UniProtKB/Swiss-Prot annotation:
Membrane topology annotation: Multi-pass membrane protein
Protein source organism: Cereibacter sphaeroides (strain ATCC 17029 / ATH 2.4.9) (Rhodobacter sphaeroides)
Family: Belongs to the complex I subunit 1 family.
Keywords: Cell inner membrane, Cell membrane, Membrane, NAD, Quinone, Translocase, Transmembrane, Transmembrane helix, Ubiquinone
Record's protein name: NADH-quinone oxidoreductase subunit H 1
Gene Ontology MF term list: NADH dehydrogenase activity; oxidoreductase activity, acting on NAD(P)H, quinone or similar compound as acceptor; quinone binding
Gene: nuoH1
Known function: NDH-1 shuttles electrons from NADH, via FMN and iron-sulfur (Fe-S) centers, to quinones in the respiratory chain. The immediate electron acceptor for the enzyme in this species is believed to be ubiquinone. Couples the redox reaction to proton translocation (for every two electrons transferred, four hydrogen ions are translocated across the cytoplasmic membrane), and thus conserves the redox energy in a proton gradient. This subunit may bind ubiquinone.
EC id: 7.1.1.-
Length: 341
């Protein structure tokens, strides 16, 4: 009995550490996003609350929490309040299987990629529920856009990940990182043999997380604020937090799948969690820069790219990877390169 309680307490403590990391990272993500956007527009950004404005995000969070929760007439109250909670919880849940270093993972399961993909796919239900429960046409249109958009690009993301699974022979994220270890540092990582898929994964991640230039579910110029129109205070904060956590999750997946996770890019330097966090921060910087400099796509353009460009290309890449790996084309060179064989 004591042993079982000890295991439960250990898991609970590890879970709290993961949640603490995600929530602390969230503060810096919002701050960094605003600072980068301000720098591109030749503004100063947050600079009043705390040193260099570092506590501005804390002040904004406190403001949201203590504001009145305004509930419009005619909404479905249980679903209205459940929707942001679903989006937030599912975004945090996926971090349970993200490894930061050998042994630094809450649950090192052999179907980690499938778990992350399932959790991120279910987030769309929070958006749909929020749009439908608001009893307003603008949130409902935004939620429908979100559903179509996420379904369209999840297919491409899944096919891209299948190529990595074929190369590794495992869906365990730790095994995928270990398969990229080698004497040539960053040239052993999967970004090189899977180079076309790196760009596709990055763009699909933007669309999957409703990030500019694909933020059509909350297009201010068309739908006011999309599915978030009727939300205020803490429910709105949960939606926003879930979005940023999902973005950071995509940064972690890019680091693990293509860029060696915690592996050092330079042979001889020690591996560790520092490299993992640094890579995630770099990819978030790219996300923020795209938001600041790329104009929003039209909805028909977004759907056309997803179904007529990304889907055929990613499907063809899976077939090519499987063919090269199975039949040892080029004397098995590609298989040895991508699989460490």
């Amino acid at each position: 009995m004591n042993s079982g309680m000890g295991i439960i307490l250990t898991i609970a403590a590890q879970g709290l550490l993961v949640i603490a990391f995600v929530m602390i990272s969230l503060l810096f993500l919002v701050y960094g996003d605003r600072k980068i956007w301000a720098a591109v527009q030749l503004r100063r950004g947050p600079n009043v609350v705390g040193a260099f404005g570092l506590l501005q995000t804390v002040a904004d969070a406190a403001k949201y929490i203590f504001k009145e929760v305004v509930v419009p007439a005619g909404v479905d109250r249980p679903v209205f309040f459940l929707a942001p909670l679903i989006s937030f919880v599912l975004a945090v849940l996926a971090w349970a299987v993200i490894p930061f270093s050998p042994g630094w993972v809450l649950s090192d399961i052999n179907v980690a990629i499938l778990f992350v993909f399932a959790a991120s796919s279910l987030e769309v239900y929070g958006v749909i529920m929020g749009g439908w429960a608001s009893n307003s046409k603008y949130p409902f249109l935004g939620s429908l856009r979100s559903a179509a958009q996420m379904i369209s690009y999840e297919v491409s993301l899944g096919l891209i990940i299948i190529g990595i699974i074929i190369s590794t022979g495992s869906m365990n994220l730790s095994h995928i990182v270990e398969a990229q270890d080698g004497a040539f540092g960053l040239f052993n990582w999967y970004w090189l043999p899977h180079l076309p898929m790196v760009a596709l994964f990055f763009i699909s991640a933007l669309a999957e997380t409703n990030r500019p230039p694909f933020d059509l579910p909350e297009a201010e110029s068309e739908l006011v604020a999309g599915f978030q129109v009727e939300y205020s205070s803490t429910p709105f904060l949960l939606f926003m937090a879930g979005e940023y956590i999902a973005i950071f999750l995509m940064c972690a997946l890019m680091s693990l799948l293509f860029f060696g996770g915690w592996l050092s890019p330079i042979p001889g330097l020690p591996d560790g969690v520092f490299w993992m966090v640094a890579k995630m921060a770099f990819f978030f910087f790219l996300f923020a820069m795209v938001k600041a400099i790329v104009p929003r796509y039209r909805y028909d353009q977004l759907m056309r790219i997803g179904w007529k460009v990304f889907l055929p290309f990613s499907l063809g890449w899976v077939v090519l990877v499987a063919f090269l790996a199975k039949f040892e084309v080029f004397g098995g060179f590609w298989a040895r390169w991508a699989m460490g064989g």
